[in-house]
UniProtKB/Swiss-Prot annotation:
The LIR motif interacts with ATG8 family proteins. This is Reticulophagy regulator 2. Its main location: endoplasmic reticulum. Keywords: Autophagy, Endoplasmic reticulum, Membrane, Phosphoprotein, Transmembrane, Transmembrane helix. Residues 507-521 have a biased composition (Pro residues). Belongs to the RETREG family. Widely expressed with highest levels in brain, lung, heart, liver and kidney (at protein level). Mainly expressed in the central nervous system and in parenchymatous organs including liver, lung and kidney. GO terms for cellular component: endoplasmic reticulum; endoplasmic reticulum membrane.
Length: 541
């Protein structure tokens, strides 16, 4: 037991030692990285300070050069660029050698450095010990939007140190992998040799000079970002259209391939095309949607409402939304307006309602008969109720009177009406459906109802017009007369003559037994009938 416990203790101690060693190594690496960063920052600071001490006398010249390079004054920058281009092509077309030009340039630099204190005295302030921040360098005379001398020195120092680091890595790679380094070096030199064979060296030098002159302008005004912002929608649209065309071509190619595979042999009859039963074939008609492409396509579309949708939305006609179906809001109002009756209909209904209230009294008041009635009297009362219902149906403005075209409204059961009897049907103007017809064209009963209180009428006077009852067949002579003289308006004399010719003389209808005779019509009733006849005469053409 003790030995096993000692073994476990030893294993636990080993694992703890490994964990501690790993932590110490990690901490050591972090400490080493921090020390390297601190050393690099210190080296950048020392190099920037040394450069600033050398360039502090050229501060005004550097600021003017920056203004020319960023085209702060376009006219001055244009003149400078034209001068440099002319000088370059003049030197390139001369017979002087490049080494001679390089030696002349170095001689000019040394002479300027030697004669600088005499011709360009130092008028700048005494330098501080070390510019540690950008705010200290901002007050050195440069513009806020341009680089000051300390900032320029710091950028130059960082660039130089970065170049040194890459050079050290390249030398280390050469020592570790000499064969790969030789192969890559030979490939790079071959590319440069081919480029120099097809492109002259003067052109390459001119491209380098233009890059040096135009690069500050591009960086300062952010021309690349602006150009990319303007071209991004066009590029996305082009990419999306090319993707759609490629998908369409691929789909057509697959369809032709499937048709070629499913083509019948040479001797067989061609089969009719049927629906695809394979899920793979059906999937070809519904391509997979790329989320990124869809998002880019939606980004270039206009999310605002069109002019037509905006006008409809402002007028309140539709409730327009992008993700819903447009809903009508005026249809309900139109239906409500259609359901409301018009003013002529309301006036006519009001007049007819008042006439019905006056005319349609109780059967007891109309008949004024004793309480004990005979069987025939009860039948007469039932006929009066039927006549009242028929009158209610005829009083509706939308009711169609089928007896108007069935023989000029002849009475039923062979009962003949005398010429002087009141008309028992509505006039043609009232039946024609014209709601604007005057009330004088209605039947005499309706005119009596509108004129005020009337004397009670017996059921025999009320019209007996069943709605759907068939009319008796007329004689052959009567059918010929109706066929030849259909829809012809006649005056009272012609009507009496026609009735006499047809054998419809003035005969009184048979009176039922044990029934009181109807009261004679008064002067008011005859005058109303006469006025109705005069109205018919005025309507005649």
């Amino acid at each position: 037991m003790a030995s096993s416990g000692g073994g476990n203790t030893g294993a636990g101690g080993t694992s703890g030692l490994g964990l501690g060693l790993g932590l110490s190594l990690g901490m050591g690496e972090a400490t080493g990285d921090a020390e390297e960063e601190a050393a690099a920052a210190e080296a950048v600071g020392r190099l920037a300070t040394s450069l600033w001490l050398r360039l502090r006398g050229w501060e005004a010249v550097l600021a003017a050069a920056q203004r020319l390079l960023v085209w702060e004054k376009p006219l001055h920058s244009l003149v400078t660029a034209a001068t440099l281009n002319g000088l370059f092509w003049l030197l390139s077309s001369s017979s002087l050698r490049p080494f001679f030009l390089l030696s002349i340039s170095l001689l000019t630099y040394f002479l300027l450095d030697l004669w600088h204190p005499r011709f360009l005295p130092d008028v700048s302030a005494p330098p501080p010990e070390e510019p540690h921040s950008d705010s200290e360098g901002a007050g050195s005379g440069a513009q806020p939007h341009l680089l000051s001398v300390p900032e320029l020195c710091r950028y130059l120092a960082e660039s130089w140190l970065t170049f040194q680091i890459h050079l050290q890595e390249l030398l280390q790679y050469k020592r570790q992998n000499p064969a790969q380094f030789c192969a890559r070096g030979c490939a790079a030199c071959a590319v440069l040799a081919v480029l120099g064979h097809y492109v002259p060296g003067v052109m390459i030098s001119y491209i380098v000079l233009l890059s040096i002159l135009l690069w500050p302008l591009v960086v300062y005004h952010e021309l690349i970002q602006r150009m990319y912002t303007r071209l991004e929608p066009l590029l996305m649209q082009l990419d999306y259209s090319m993707k759609a065309e490629a998908d369409a071509l691929h789909h057509k190619h697959d369809k032709r391939k499937r048709q070629g595979k499913s083509a019948p042999p040479a001797g067989d009859e061609p089969l009719a095309e049927t629906e695809s039963e394979s899920e793979a074939e059906l999937a070809g008609f519904s391509p997979v949607v790329d989320v990124k492409k869809t998002a880019l396509a939606l980004a270039i579309t206009d999310s605002e409402l069109s002019d037509e949708e905006a006008s409809i939305l402002e007028s309140g006609g539709f409730s327009v939304s992008r993700a819903t179906t447009p809903q009508l809001t005026d249809v309900s109002e139109d239906l409500d307006q259609q359901s409301l009756p018009s003013e002529p209909e309301e006036a006519l209904n009001r007049e007819l309602g008042e006439g019905e209230e006056t005319e349609l009294a109780s059967p007891e008041d109309l008949l004024s008969a004793p309480p004990a009635l005979s069987k025939q009297a009860l039948d007469t009362e039932e006929e009066g109720a039927a006549d009242k219902e028929a009158l209610l149906q005829l009083s509706s403005p939308l009711h169609f009177v089928n007896t108007h075209f069935n023989g000029a409204g002849s009475p039923q059961d062979g009962v003949k009406c005398p010429p002087g009897a009141p008309v028992k049907t509505l006039s043609p103007e009232a039946v024609s459906g014209d709601l604007m017809a005057p009330s004088s064209t209605l039947s005499p009963q309706l005119c009596l109802a509108e004129s005020g209180p009337v004397t009670p009428l017996s059921p025999s006077v009320l019209p007996s017009l069943p709605q759907d009852s068939p009319q008796p067949l007329a004689a052959p002579e009567e059918e010929e007369a109706l066929t030849t003289e259909d829809f012809e308006l006649l005056d009272q004399g012609e009507l009496e003559q026609l009735n006499a010719e047809l054998g419809l003389g003035p005969e009184m209808p048979p009176k039922p037994p044990d029934v009181l005779p109807p009261p004679p019509l008064g002067a008011d009733s005859h005058s109303l009938v006469q006025s109705d006849q005069e109205a018919h005469a005025e309507v005649e053409p």
